[in-house]
Amino acid sequence: MSSGGLLLLLGLLTLWEILTPVSSKDHPEFCELPADSGPCRGILHAFYYHPVHRTCLEFIYGGCYGNANNFKTIDECKRTCAA
C-alpha cells in the first residue's frame, strides 16, 4: 500500500475513534436509564448519569422507588457511570 493510502487509512481510523460514542460497556447498564423521580412526594436533590451528554446532572428525587441511576452525590455518579 502506498504512503498516501496508509495516511488516508490512518485518518479514517482516527476520525472513527473520535466520532464513535463511548460504549455502554464502559459503565453499568443502569447508567443508561432515564432520571426517575419515583411516585413519592419528597424533594431530595439527587444526581443521575445522562448518557447522551456523558455527564452527571442534578434532578429532584421523590424519595422512593425510581431506578438505580440515582446517586446522592455527583462524585458517586461520576465514579460509577462517567469514569
Curated annotation (Swiss-Prot):
Transmembrane segments: none
Ribosomal protein recorded as keyword: no
Keyword S-adenosyl-L-methionine appears in the UniProt entry: no
Primary location: secreted
Keywords: Disulfide bond, Protease inhibitor, Secreted, Serine protease inhibitor, Signal
SUPFAM superfamilies in alphabetical order: BPTI-like
InterPro entries to which the protein is assigned, alphabetical: Kunitz_BPTI, Kunitz_BPTI_sf, Prtase_inh_Kunz-CS, TFPI/VKTCI-like
Site (Reactive bond for trypsin): 41-42
Cellular-component GO terms for this entry: extracellular space
Signal peptide: 1-24
Record's subcellular location: Secreted
Disulfide bonds: 31-81, 40-64, 56-77
Tissue: Expressed by the venom gland.
Highest taxon, organism lineage: Eukaryota
Gene3D superfamilies in alphabetical order: Pancreatic trypsin inhibitor Kunitz domain (4.10.410.10)
Stored PROSITE patterns: BPTI_KUNITZ_1 (PS00280), BPTI_KUNITZ_2 (PS50279)
All copies of domain BPTI/Kunitz inhibitor, residue ranges: 31-81
GO MF assignments: serine-type endopeptidase inhibitor activity
Protein purpose: Serine protease inhibitor.
Family per record: Belongs to the venom Kunitz-type family.
Protein name: Kunitz-type serine protease inhibitor carinatin-2
Lineage: Eukaryota, Metazoa, Chordata, Craniata, Vertebrata
